[in-house]
Amino acid sequence: IAMVKIEGLYNTAFCYTPVLEDAARAQIQSVCDQKEFAGCKIRVMPDVHAGKGCTIGTTMTIRDKIVPGMVGVDIGCGMETVELSEREIDFERLDALIRKEIPYGREVRDEIHALNAELDLSQLCCADQVNLNRAMRSIGSLGGGNHFIEVDRAEDGRLFLVVHSGSRHLGTEVANFYQDEGRRALWGGAHYQIKATIDQMKAEGRFKEIQKTITALKREHDLSIPKDLAYVEGALFDDYIHDMKLTQKFAVLNRKAMVDVILSGMGLTPVDEFTTIHNYIDTDAMILRKGSVSAKAGEKLLIPINMRDGSLICSGKGNEDWNCSAPHGAGRLMSRKAAFNALSMEEFQKEMEGIYTTCVVPDTLDESPMAYKSMEEIVAQIGPTAEIIERIRPVYNFKAAD
């Protein structure tokens, strides 16, 4: 398979892709250039593309430091895949049910879903930084962007319900709090200490020593790490891991609540169900996955490609060289902005023919199949880490604009 090697000052990353955009290369290079991440095993998945503050498709082993921004704001985002016993579904009725019962975009539920009982968000270390009421009413809400509800059909006619969503605004609140705390811990005290020292030296008339002292203090506090890579360690590390796991559970319950609304509202019967998560830290193996999924030996996982081509159901191979990971999708070919500028609604409508959807609208053009890498590119690369069990194709799709 194709691979790009990126050598930095303190680490070397392997990217399992034939081509790598410059922005993603620069982000990965920046991580490899920090001595704090020396010794971390960095493996980047085939669906790699530049993201906000970090590269989508990143996997890396971690020890005593974590960059909250590398996990990102949608902590625990992923897919719930449910095999159904039914072979036919009334899609018009399903679409009406979703629009009536599942909030999407920025909306949340009026009433709290029963699954809230399985989670106590007041246990968050950063609970006072979070809108708990909004969070509780968000369990059972889809959100926007690339989140979707889909029904897919296997070759033999079996139907699958797939729900892709995450931790909604709660994840953003938790991520931003810890990223800010990391910055404050790394630099806030240093800047304050430098200013206080200068004031004191001025008061004592030691003007000639000021510059030398500032240089020494800056070296001591190492203010060289990029803002996006501010990390947490010590007690903050422990608090972040604790809150990330709670937020991850919240994201799982959010998807399960939507599945519950659909199954009960439509009278559908589940046969099998599995979860695939792609923004989190696997605390058992201490592996960070950002836009990548776990692919341990025999583990069932879903790789969604796009609205037209559906998803691959795979089995992990437990390849240590890949950090036991696989791509979380096809990966974007163009940015959202570029997609809105370059793509046409005519082409979008043509590509989605034969799939029941009320969501092929100008606002979702950035999510059209043309905005993503091809299925062939991903299939060509994943052999060492995952075995494709079957491909499932969309027959119904619901996706909200932001």
Kindly give the residue locations of the regions a language model identified.
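A generic, well-ordered mixed alpha/beta core segment in the N-terminal half of proteins
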Residues: 68-124
